[in-house]
Amino acid sequence: MSVIDPADVARRLDQLRNDLDAIGGDHVEIVAVTKGFGPDAAQAAITCGLTVLGENYAQELAAKAEHLLAAGEERETAPEWHFIGHLQSNKVASLAPHVAVWQTVDRLKLGTRIAAHSPGSRVYVQVNVTDEPQKAGCQPHEVGQLVADLTSLDLDVQGLMTVGRQGDVSETRSAFDHLVSLADDLELPTRSMGMSADYAVAVAAGSTMLRIGSKLFGPRPPKATP
């Protein structure tokens, strides 16, 4: 696995921030997504001042969080980890010591498990606004009830999250607009939408949080074969 050079990340981050400034997105929070990269990507992000990191897989998040702690990061000053992938309920207990924000809560069973292992946690509801069967997320008409149910568990529901449709700018913009409308109706301030390939569309639609991986760290290394 290639080593991530913090200088390269800093250069890409400067370019990204310049791009965001040009499209009115200077207020948008960046979640640095280290999926598929080694712990050095997380360390490089921290070196560049990126304090919010995102992971898609439970095992990767736990391993990187523990690596940073072992390398000398104090738990109080360690990065804020967001879990942004599809999550099985049985993984919650192992992640609870590390995760600050659970971005992909899409069913009550998962919320109940989070409330049991990490009471009062910050959560976002993932919504499948593109109606693609292969994607996780609750349906738009289910959002209001799920938010109410999660709130009744004393979870801190702060926003909504979605993934756009790949390769279709018009449909992605429509999906992002739909998410913003849902968040507005529910008075939820955070709209986590937009990744490396569609962040400009997301910002135009009203994103408050981008999940950025390859735009910061370069192409992901190929998965190791057994």
Feature names for model-found ranges:
Residues 1-189, 195-197, 203-205, 217-219:
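Conserved alpha/beta-domain cores
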Residues 207-225:
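Gly/Pro- and small hydrophobic-enriched strand-loop and loop-to-helix capping segments
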